[in-house]
């Protein structure tokens, strides 16, 4: 058996005394405010950040953005808000000790959705013997931005 964490929230996202590299609570409160105001607009904007879409960069197709939007709107408004609290406030660090199998952590250094320091790097440091592969500049949705590289790394590790 082996485990792989890809752009995972494992670690702890919320900034507090025990997690100075975390994300300020105001960011998550802002997300919830935006969801309540206009969930559809939030989801469209969120997808662009998720995949690293900018003014001059578009690492995924409009189809991928549309697919992500459809997935998001299938969740209820309450579930969408609850999801923000779940990924922001759940501290997975105590679970690291339970990993007793070879573990690969893959995370993009350009991930603005789930920053690498309190998650990917924290997981790699907290899980005994874990291997960290950082994808330089890649966003959270690296499964869609660099699928060939991800698949190759998975095959090599899991073989």
Regions found by a protein language model. Give the residues of each.
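A conserved short beta-strand
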Residues: 1-14
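Conserved hydrophobic packing residues within short motifs/helices of P-loop NTPase cores
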Residues: 4, 104-106, 133
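Conserved alpha/beta-hydrolase catalytic His-Asp/Glu region
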Residues: 14-23, 33-97
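Residue-level signal for the nucleotide or nucleotide-sugar donor/cofactor binding architecture
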Residues: 75, 114, 145
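Short beta-strand/loop motif that positions the catalytic acidic residue
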Residues: 99, 105-107, 111
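Acidic beta-to-alpha connecting loop that harbors the catalytic carboxylate
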Residues: 109-112, 137-139
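Conserved alpha/beta-hydrolase "acid-adjacent" motif
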Residues: 112-118
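Catalytic active-site module of serine/aspartate enzymes centered on a nucleophile-bearing elbow/loop
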Residues: 127-159
